[in-house]
């Protein structure tokens, strides 16, 4: 493949990704049939805080507009969480994972079935909740429920398909980019609201400046932590083949501090959001539920405790299923590599695992700090929820990963062209 064709392929992938994200954004403005928009606005104006506010941000504002993508990609993420957990404890799923490409295809299919089931359940709960709100549904009844469930399930599955298309034919991880696009689309409204709070005197100008300084520092901190590596020195012995000596070189095994990326924050959020997707509507007039839901708002100890626990758990869990120290040690021994001062095999695996555990601990604390520190500000000042730490983390990490993929493809294209020039030069 020539440099020009490689560049054209990259350009086409980027344009394809932008097109798919534009289709997604269009879908967030297509309303569910049978909803009174005026009554919906009145209801949503009083339900923009807490977990429902976070869910609305992740869905790109589709919840506040009660669009066909109102559930966003969360049913798929929730299904993925369940399947990933089963992979760690179930022999059946462990065997599927060990079967390679065939097993992964089967796991993907099971995840899709789980997505349909969750979207159906949540769609039905949503339809019941909408009907319980006075004058919100124009013609309540079985017809509305069937239409809503069908539309919600179709919208969720279409959104999942869009994400898969981005991953296969575009740039970056499709599911992450859809969440990224939803958050970015809500940022302008958050900025306008923040400046309006300053203009009216609800928040001092000094506090707004402090907020933006903290925002910049948080972004820089995230970039630093995502780029940070712990390099393990790997040596290769010299080997004589004929009259020549080969090998004797050194390399490094790079381990990221945050091996799990943004997945723990997304999974922890999805776990908290799972019961909220319809309960805010279904029990909106229930006093017990209202008292219980008050504990799941910004700054509340129970909310932050559950969120922090979820982030820490999924950081360790996801790292354990994506990086296997024993497998890495076996591959090193197979190719003659060794860590200086450490015996090949089991000792090397234990050494790598020990380092990985320390790095994962730091990574879990870093993710928890970034996601929860802004919650203290949100709890004490009238700052829009869209500027929460989780939103910032997802935007920055997904942007870094996407730019890295683009750079990798460009470098690969340049390297291929250099090799061809070298061959022609000979």
Regions found by a protein language model. Give the residues of each.
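N-terminal cationic and glycine-rich segments that engage phosphates or anionic surfaces
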Residues: 1-97, 102-426
């Amino acid at each position: 493949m020539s440099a020009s064709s490689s560049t054209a392929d990259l350009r086409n992938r980027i344009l394809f990704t932008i097109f798919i994200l534009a289709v997604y954004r269009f879908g967030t403005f297509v309303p569910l049939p049978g909803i009174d928009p005026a009554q919906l606005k009145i209801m949503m104006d009083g339900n923009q805080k807490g977990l429902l506010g976070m869910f609305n941000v992740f869905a790109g504002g589709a919840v506040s507009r009660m669009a066909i993508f109102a559930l966003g990609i969360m049913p798929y993420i929730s299904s993925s969480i369940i399947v990933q957990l089963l992979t760690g404890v179930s022999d059946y799923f462990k065997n599927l994972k060990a079967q390679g490409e065939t097993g992964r295809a089967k796991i993907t299919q099971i995840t899709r079935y789980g997505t349909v089931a969750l979207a159906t359940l949540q769609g039905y709960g949503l339809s019941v909740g909408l009907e319980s709100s006075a004058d919100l549904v124009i013609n309540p009844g079985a017809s509305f429920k069937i239409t809503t469930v069908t539309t919600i399930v179709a919208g969720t599955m279409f959104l999942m398909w869009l994400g898969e298309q981005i991953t296969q034919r575009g740039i970056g991880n499709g599911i992450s980019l859809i969440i990224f696009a939803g958050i970015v689309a809500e940022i302008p409204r958050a900025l306008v609201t923040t400046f309006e709070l300053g203009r009216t005197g609800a928040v001092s100008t000094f506090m707004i400046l402090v907020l933006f300084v903290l925002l910049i520092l948080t972004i820089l901190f995230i970039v630093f932590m995502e780029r940070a590596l712990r390099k393990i020195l790997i040596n290769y012995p010299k080997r004589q083949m004929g009259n020549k000596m080969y090998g004797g070189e050194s390399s490094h095994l790079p381990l990221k501090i945050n091996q799990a990326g943004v997945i723990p924050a997304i999974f922890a959020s999805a776990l908290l959001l799972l019961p909220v997707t319809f309960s805010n509507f279904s029990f909106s007039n229930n006093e017990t539920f209202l008292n219980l839901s008050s504990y799941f708002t910004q700054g509340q100890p129970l909310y932050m405790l559950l969120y922090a626990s979820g982030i820490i758990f999924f950081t360790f869990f996801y790292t354990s299923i994506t990086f296997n120290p024993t497998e890495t040690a076996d591959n090193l021994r197979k190719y003659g590599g060794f860590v200086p001062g450490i015996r090949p095999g089991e000792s090397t695996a234990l050494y790598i695992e020990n380092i990985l555990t320390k790095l994962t601990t730091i990574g879990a604390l870093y993710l928890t700090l970034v996601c929860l520190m802004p919650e203290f500000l949100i709890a004490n000042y009238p700052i829009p929820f869209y500027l929460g730490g989780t939103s910032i983390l997802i935007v920055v990490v997904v942007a870094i990963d996407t730019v890295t993929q683009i750079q990798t493809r460009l470098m690969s294209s340049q390297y291929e062209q250099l090799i061809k020039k070298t061959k022609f030069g000979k």
